[in-house]
Each structure stands twice: as structure tokens, then as C-alpha cells.
Amino acid sequence: MKTFTPDSSIASDVIPSPNHGDRNNGRVADMILLHYTGMPDVEGAIAQLCTPGTDKSAHYIVLEDGRIVQSVPEAKRAWHAGISSWAGEEDINSCSIGVEIINRGHDWGYPDFPSRQIAAVTAL
């Protein structure tokens, strides 16, 4: 897949995901959605978000050590919110930036988010 220049100067790497499309009806992002990955390791999470056919992606992935990886350009519609609505808005994927925070989640003891990771999310 063709790479791109990160939108954020603090993104340390680009791992392009093919799982994205155009924002519907010319929408622009006016909200940010934070998610945690809920997977046992970073490799599995990145594979899930960046492998063709998984129908999942995010604009940014924030690693436990604070590094930020961009996977979808901000101008595109990442597939992170599913069929969703909020405050009367439909198709949240078309009006949001999706940020996946690497964390194993409930099935693996729900560890604390490291301070470097929290600082990176805040800076992003």
C-alpha cells in the first residue's frame, strides 16, 4: 500500500491501512474518538487495523511507550466507530478522528495506561 506523510508532526511512523474511504458528503472531522484496542499485544492490534479485509482502522495508534503511528490520513474516513450516532449525528466515522490506544483491556487484566502513553494521547 502507498504510504503518506503524517498529518501530525508527533507521529513517529506511518503504517498505512487499506481499510478506509472518503468521508461522506464532504464532511470534515469535528470530533475525536478514543478507543483502546482490547487485544493481547501491539502486533495483533496493528495487524487487525492494517490488514485488508478486517474492515477496521483508525487514524492513529498510540503505543504503550508513547510512540504515535498514523494509519489513515485525517482527510479520509477510518472505520473505527461502526454503525454509530451521537448527539443527533449519524455516521460518526465521517466526522471524527479515530485514535486507538494500545491496551489489552478487560480480558487481559485491564492494565493501567502508562504515563508516556497518556502524555502522547494528550499531545495528539
Residue map of PLM features:
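Active-site-adjacent loop/helix surface patches within enzyme catalytic domains
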Residues: 2-123
